UniProtKB/Swiss-Prot annotation:
One of its GO terms (cellular component) is cytoplasm. Disulfide bonds: none annotated. Belongs to the GroES chaperonin family. Together with the chaperonin GroEL, plays an essential role in assisting protein folding. The GroEL-GroES system forms a nano-cage that allows encapsulation of the non-native substrate proteins and provides a physical environment optimized to promote and accelerate protein folding. GroES binds to the apical surface of the GroEL ring, thereby capping the opening of the GroEL channel. One of its GO terms (biological process) is chaperone cofactor-dependent protein refolding. It comes from the Bacteria. GO terms for molecular function: ATP binding; metal ion binding; protein folding chaperone; protein-folding chaperone binding; unfolded protein binding. NCBIfam families: PRK00364.1-2, PRK00364.1-5, PRK00364.2-2, PRK00364.2-4, PRK00364.2-5. Heptamer of 7 subunits arranged in a ring. Interacts with the chaperonin GroEL. Keywords: Chaperone, Cytoplasm. It comes from Holospora obtusa. It is found in: Cytoplasm. This is Co-chaperonin GroES.
């Protein structure tokens, strides 16, 4: 992957792959798949600044599994792979 470092309070997330088949074995076409709302954090920015200019570090870290909104962030393609760049505030929480 191309080296990418998010700025500010942004994070780079790789979506988990959507299911290809139902439990009954029916193949789901790409047009009918729901966008997964779960992914793995690939890279994190340094954090946001408060009004006094102090750096507030991000709570999520590289490797965390996170849940986020279906329409969160901006989809980008780096080295032929699909990722999402979003603000940390778009993340609902981490998955243990």
């Amino acid at each position: 992957m191309t080296k990418f470092k998010p700025l500010g309070d942004r994070i780079l997330v790789k979506r988990v792959e959507a299911e290809e088949r139902t439990s009954g074995g029916i193949v789901i076409p790409d047009t009918a798949k729901e966008k997964p709302i779960e992914g793995t954090v690939i890279a994190v920015g340094p954090g946001a600044r408060d009004p006094q200019g102090n750096l507030i570090a991000l709570e999520v870290k590289q490797g965390d599994r996170v849940l986020f909104g279906k329409w969160s962030g901006t989809e980008v393609k780096l080295s032929g792979e699909d990722y999402i760049v979003m603000k940390e505030s778009d993340v609902f929480g981490t998955i243990a």
